[in-house]
Amino acid sequence: MNPNCARCCKIVYPTEKVNCLDKFWHKACFHCETCKMTLNMKNYKGYEKKPYCNAHYPKQSFTMVADTPENLRLKQQSELQSQVRYKEEFEKNKGKGFSVVADTPELQRIKKTQDQISNIKYHEEFEKSRMGPSGGEGLECERRDPQESSYRRPQEQQQPHHIPASTPVYQQPQQQPAAQSYGGYKEPAAPASIQRSAPGGGGKRYRAVYDYSAADEDEVSFQDGDTIVNVQQIDDGWMYGTVERTGDTGMLPANYVEAI
């Protein structure tokens, strides 16, 4: 059924229908309320569901109110009521405030990572408290660099150990029995039957808990179980000392050795 025009109240057929301001109009009836200028959907402005042109669109004006004592009192009372209501709502919602966060895959990944970090820290503290202060150093080094140890060990087995030819010694066999693993702790490999005597000296003595291959000229290579003498601490990550088996002196990583 065809609707009626909002202005002339006659039937509006689809060919001349204008649907605007929640009403139906003839194209000729859709004009400004003041100047009767024909309008369209691009240049009309609606006010109280009536069409107006841009020139005759009603302007909103503000009424000036005198700043009398009565008005000041009402203004102050309104502000006090707003503050009281705000404080009441604040006290009511105190401790209950929370923000809703979308459960995205990125947030799930971050939450899972935080749970894993917390679990690792808990087990680390538990192992330290169970082993005591003296037995926890080797495990700490083992936990700190397990990947570096497994990465460097095959490289050390492939390369023969360099021993100066000036002193006749028996060469250590390359293939050594694999170190057995109990939990997170690895037994050191069996040392060579005959080792070259290195000049002893004072200072701190450390024992290697991993194999290490020198990556620079000022570093030294050593094997698991070697004794490092004359050790001097450079910083938190590096030391300087002499490998007692080979007599080489240079820098070595601090997390590859433990104090004797």
Curated annotation (Swiss-Prot):
Stretches assigned to the SH3 domain: 201-260
Basic and acidic residues composition-biased segments: 140-155
GO cellular component: cell cortex; cytoskeleton; focal adhesion
Principal location: cytoplasm
Record Pfam families: LIM, Nebulin, SH3_9
UniProt GO molecular function: actin filament binding; metal ion binding
Subcellular location: Cytoplasm, Cell cortex; Cytoplasm, Cytoskeleton
First and last residues of every Nebulin repeat: 61-95, 97-131
Swiss-Prot/TrEMBL keywords: Acetylation, Actin-binding, Cytoplasm, Cytoskeleton, Ion transport, LIM domain, Metal-binding, Methylation, Phosphoprotein, Repeat, SH3 domain, Transport, Zinc
List of residues that carry Phosphoserine: 99, 118, 134
Phosphothreonine: modified positions: 68, 104
Residue span(s) of domain LIM zinc-binding: 5-56
Post-translational modification, as annotated: Phosphorylated.
Protein name (record): LIM and SH3 domain protein 1
Organism: Bos taurus (Bovine)
